[in-house]
Regions:
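Bacterial N-terminal signal peptides that target proteins for export
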Residues: 2-12
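A short, hydrophobic C-terminal helix/tail in secreted or cell-surface proteins
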Residues: 219-238
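Sec/Tat signal peptide C-region and signal peptidase I cleavage site
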Residues: 23-27
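Short, charged juxtamembrane terminal tails flanking transmembrane helices
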Residues: 241-245
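Short, surface-exposed polybasic-aromatic patches that bind anionic ligands, especially phosphate groups
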Residues: 28-215
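Serine/threonine-rich, low-complexity intrinsically disordered segments
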Residues: 4-5, 20, 225
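Bacterial N-terminal signal peptides
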Residues: 13-22
Length: 245
């Protein structure tokens, strides 16, 4: 029996699907808390401290942390979604916020390039103009406003200022628009660019809670492991084929 390309493709698809199902069988949880630098703008914005997630936090520079090793600082994406500080929630990782409030289309609001570009630098400890020290709360204020701007939360907090528009005194927002060339370009979907993703939170009853930002490092290990599993499975099929000849 010969193995056609069609059968090889099916084998790879089945193995990949099995790996995905196995990884999603156990619900992941995290705890999200406020800290002394939260709510810098009086509108309930970040940063917030996320702990117990089990996520790889190696992309976060120590200077960006408030809660210490194993935690990371995040910001909210949807102005009209909420969470209870100190609570533990289930989460999934995606490139878009579920529901998404102001910028959602079809119940999904992809992270924008402007948001991804800024947050990745914040996490890396390299965001120009961000005060990681005593002035952190003020910096958080303007960074959170920039995220809400790029995620099209404007209808929710229209008229808020200063700092909620290009040329309105928000250095982070202005830098992102300048880097990408226009507001429209900075609001384009990131699709995982800069390693930035969304943590979509739900409570024990499945109710949506405030979606949060997360940045990861490229994981070559998982890709190679899946490829190895696929190749091992293919080798097994080939051996079985030879026995049946």
């Amino acid at each position: 029996m010969t193995i056609s390309r069609f059968h090889v493709s099916r084998i790879f698809a089945i193995l990949a699907g099995t790996a995905v199902l196995a990884s999603s069988a156990v619900a992941a949880t995290l705890t999200i808390s406020t800290n002394a630098s939260s709510n810098g703008n009086g509108l309930g914005g970040g940063s917030y401290t996320i702990s117990g997630s089990g996520l790889d936090t190696s992309a976060y520079a120590p200077i960006s942390l408030v809660g210490g090793a194993g935690t990371f600082e995040s910001f909210c994406l949807e102005y009209t979604e909420y969470f209870s500080p100190g609570s533990t929630y289930n989460y999934t990782v995606a490139n878009a916020a579920v529901a998404g409030a102001g910028g959602a289309v079809g119940g999904q609001d992809p992270v924008s390039l402007g948001t991804a570009w800024l947050y990745s630098q914040f996490a890396n400890g390299t965001l120009s103009g961000f005060d990681y020290g005593a002035g952190r709360k003020t910096s958080n204020n303007f960074l959170q406003l920039a995220f809400w701007f790029f995620e099209d939360e404007t209808p929710s907090i229209s008229g808020y200022g200063p700092g909620y528009g290009f040329g309105d005194g928000n250095a982070f927002l202005d830098a992102a628009v300048t880097f990408f060339g226009s507001e429209a370009a900075a609001k384009a979907d990131a699709n995982g660019a800069y390693g930035v993703q969304v943590l979509n939170l739900t409570d024990k009853n499945g109710n949506n809670k405030q979606s949060q930002l997360y940045v990861s490092v490229p994981d070559a290990g998982s890709t190679m492991a899946l490829l190895g599993l696929a190749m091992a499975g293919l080798a097994g099929v080939q051996r079985l084929s030879r026995r049946r000849r």
